[in-house]
Amino acid sequence: MNNTFLLLGNQLFDPQILKDRGCKRVFMAEDYGLCTYEKHHKLKIYLYLCAMREYKDELQRNGIQVDYFSLDDRLDKKTYIEFFIEFSREQKIDKINIFEIENKFFEKKVLSSLEKAGIEYEISETPMFLFSRKEFGSLYGKNKSFRLGNFYKVGRKKFNILVDGEGNPLGDRWSFDEENRKKIPAKTHIPELPKFNLSKYHDAVASIVEKLFSEHPGNAENVWFPVTRSEALDLLDDFLIQRFENFGAYEDAML
């Protein structure tokens, strides 16, 4: 079994998912193209880079070898896939595992490049979504269009959300859209966001962002979000405990 995986910057999954698939080694590379295909805010680029570096450490703590390349390692401006193919040839890797890539254009480019380079690949189903590609595709049937309202019905039945034992909606309602457009009252208490420690990579990444992406909007000073998986899960817990109860009524409101 081939046990080397190519992981993109948005595929920072629970390491156990990789271990369950026999993963022993991972290739990760920061990519200039990812940071510049749009003129992203500097904090978004900061999140990309810090999260990837923190995830590298998490994989290593789980006994997975990581071949990691920062932007400083890639100043020759090769594309992401060109860089990976060069790495594979140097390491004599002739087969790679990848997860489905949600960007279909980029996925097609990656797969065709691997084929041209003579590198075999095995594709694993992504754990990123609630519906698999096959399952989602089957929802369309012969219809040329598929409305969100129909998708919600399927999802509620699949996950048993507000339905009875026969799959009928509780209260005879499939939609509650008209109830999520309330204005937030002026005296409503909105809990403060939890505080997170800066990443150990903060200084290095903030410096890279300012040096390489100086023309992008914003700055990398006001970091208010987590950059590790564990702290992101903590933030989710905080949302469910502190905010979820009233989220539905005000989800379309702006402050």
Language model segments and positions:
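N-terminal beta-strand-loop-alpha-helix module at the start
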Residues: 1-71
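Short alpha-helical segments and helix-capping/turn motifs at coil-helix boundaries
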Residues: 8-16, 80-84, 106-109, 253
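An acidic- and aromatic-residue-enriched active-site/binding cleft used to recognize and process polar
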Residues: 10, 31, 71-72, 101-103, ...
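Gly/Thr-rich phosphate-binding loop signature of adenosyl cofactor/nucleotide-binding cores
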Residues: 234-255
